[in-house]
Design a protein with these regions (language model features):
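Bacterial N-terminal signal peptides
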Residues: 11-25
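Compositionally biased, intrinsically disordered or flexible polar/acidic segments
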Residues: 27-195
């Protein structure tokens, strides 16, 4: 077996070490939509994983909880509207950004039971009534068909949380999204370990 030793200028050695550390970091997989390597689950000190879907930087909410950005989504675009006032929540900052048009989310987590909380809000000003933001999603085999976000949230600029108990047996939490009328959209995901 041969050992390869790269020859790099001293200024790059630190960057290489940081890059190597980043590549094994559980916080963000290498590319959007790619499942992280085996054994790279990110679990906060509390055990809860908090993912902010529409931002590329971490967010600390009004309760002091830290939400980390994710590259666990396949497809989609982001929008941040920091000036919005969001009702029905104590953590409005979590709902001011969104990921929309995504098709899939896959996150490597340890096997076990979890409560998956999907955080939604209608923040796009062109959506002003029912049937304008309708999509379906599937969380580990549990299907939510014809999910009308405007109706579920009770209108625009209102937070809505869908909580789904799941049992992970293959090391991956998978959520599939299908557009029906408008784009699927999501603000954040919480993955809470259960006994």
């Amino acid at each position: 077996m041969k050992t390869l030793s790269p020859i790099l200028p001293p200024s790059l050695h630190t960057g290489l070490v940081a890059l190597l550390l980043l590549s094994v970091s559980p916080a963000i997989p290498a590319s959007r939509g790619a499942a992280p390597a085996a054994g790279t689950a990110l679990v906060a000190a509390s055990g809860t994983i908090r993912i902010i879907a529409g931002l590329s930087a971490p967010l600390t909410d009004e309760k002091g909880e830290k939400w980390l950005p994710s590259r666990d989504f396949l497809d989609g675009d982001t929008m941040d509207r920091p000036e919005l006032s969001i009702a029905n929540t104590e953590i409005p900052s979590v709902y001011r950004s969104e990921l929309f048009g995504m098709t899939r989310f896959v996150r490597r987590i340890p096997n076990g039971n979890y409560l998956v909380k999907l955080h939604f809000a209608v923040t796009y000003e062109a959506i002003d009534g029912p049937r304008q933001c309708v999509f379906s999603f599937d969380v580990e085999g549990r299907s939510f068909k014809d999910f009308d976000l405007f109706v579920r949230a009770g209108g625009a600029l209102k937070a809505y949380v869908e909580s789904i108990p799941v049992a992970i047996r293959d090391g991956d939490l998978e959520i599939k999204f299908t557009a029906l009328s408008g784009n699927p959209t999501i603000s954040a995901i919480e993955i809470v370990p259960q006994p």
